[in-house]
Amino acid sequence: MARLVLGLVSCTFFLAVSGLYSSSDDVIELTPSNFNREVIQSDGLWLVEFYAPWCGHCQRLTPEWKKAATALKDVVKVGAVNADKHQSLGGQYGVQGFPTIKIFGANKNKPEDYQGGRTGEAIVDAALSALRQLVKDRLGGRSGGYSSGKQGRGDSSSKKDVVELTDDTFDKNVLDSEDVWMVEFYAPWCGHCKNLEPEWAAAATEVKEQTKGKVKLAAVDATVNQVLASRYGIKGFPTIKIFQKGESPVDYDGGRTRSDIVSRALDLFSDNAPPPELLEIINEDIAKKTCEEHQLCVVAVLPHILDTGAAGRNSYLEVLLKLADKYKKKMWGWLWTEAGAQYELENALGIGGFGYPAMAAINARKMKFALLKGSFSEQGINEFLRELSFGRGSTAPVGGGSFPTITPREPWDGKDGELPVEDDIDLSDVELDDLEKDEL
């Protein structure tokens, strides 16, 4: 009996840590290796749940998700991604909390967020509504844009962000560039090249957006541009090479799906990108621009300069710079100010109740923030940021529901603070003898 109980506990634990769904369910388990093939290249409608096995809300959703999958079988595809295990997929679609449900309709590159109820009935209703809309769009001749990946190389709209290179343009664009280049050498008749083309095109667009053009994807017809093919020893198709300034080209040996290519490109970007700027909040433009142009902006409120001196403040800034470099792949914004300088910002974020220094991370798009409640140390901040990167941690709405007003101020001059100089009082007219008599 004890062995039976232990076995049941072990099985339960295994299921809890490995995933919430099994092959016997009607829910299709999705991973980086099959997501593009199953979802992106599909003509049908998909509902995809991004979950974490440890998430209580996900566990409560599981039976309802299975119920919906069974009801929608052969009508609408219902899938699930263990985003705790496959973080690249979660990051690719901006998943910040669990569970997150997305509807992949006509335009698979721009899924819609599902905001409905968490019951099987509500999920089925939403799926059928989305399916009706998909059919109406098709009747109206709207395809939803590039999604199926079936266009050929002749369709320039599907590969607008892939740079076509030739023997004449290669050196100027690639070798003389400070950017990182991933170059595909292909042959028009090559079947593997045709299969790669839609993945390469979709990846090019996403990489351009996420790296702001610092990593570029290109293509060379090696049957026409034989000088390049000979120079780089191209003997099979497709061959992908990575070019970085001042280094010899290296072969790309990763997967051939969009997510694989994007993941490698982001790694290259992270390796070559300088650390993010750590900016002092001295006006509204700096604060709003930093927060609105990044998925998250990390705001540190340091003690007043009179409390720490220049040495103390610089030690805090060094910690922040170190962590900004560590998390630069996330492409967050980084800001700092001193206690009391931005009262409305502190008030909107609930900062100050735990003393200084303090920290918050703001999502300006959703007007929500998370507050550091651990120690303001490298280890404490790292744990806080790590939880954020996994979509964990509690959040709250920004006070007032909008970005707080920023008070313009002069930037810190890098020096120790000075106490205000008191005005000298002229005592020459004071009759001390008269004061003594009056006191008596």
UniProtKB/Swiss-Prot annotation:
Pfam families given in the database record: Thioredox_PDIA6_C, Thioredoxin
Enzyme Commission number(s) from the entry: 5.3.4.1
Disulfide bridge map: 55-58, 190-193
Leader sequence residues: 1-19
Prevents secretion from ER, short sequence motif: residues: 437-440
UniProt-annotated location(s): Endoplasmic reticulum lumen; Cell membrane; Melanosome
Name of the protein this chain belongs to: Protein disulfide-isomerase A6
Organism per entry: Mus musculus
Classification of source organism: Eukaryota, Metazoa, Chordata, Craniata, Vertebrata
